[in-house]
Amino acid sequence: MMDPHHEADAEHAPTDSAALDRLRRFGGGKLLRDMIALFLVAAPERLASARSALAADNVGGTELALHSLKSSSAQLGAMRMYHLCDQGEQRARDGSLVGVPALIDELEQEFARVREWLASARDEGTS
């Protein structure tokens, strides 16, 4: 049985531990470590691409960057990031970037939480 402190941590976790467990079961600790490492490098690049596209008023570039980040976020169970990306992607797909800067701000804040959580998960239990 989980202790209450661990349950509280799980409730506020920025990633879904079930998604990480599925990856661990599918490919072992090495696959999970590799996917986390790739995400921790690629996510900031995707966020920067989204920001650049947004600054250039490039709707298609914004949509593409957010779509890419959405997919990788879902794979690692970062569902708040996934939903924020989805909202921004949908707005861009509809031809509007209204509200997208605020979504990207939120994404950057959420990524900071996810990055810390995934780095800890990678270091603790991915063998």
Q: What are these regions, as identified by a protein language model?
A:
Residues 1-64, 68-127:
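Two-component system phosphorelay core
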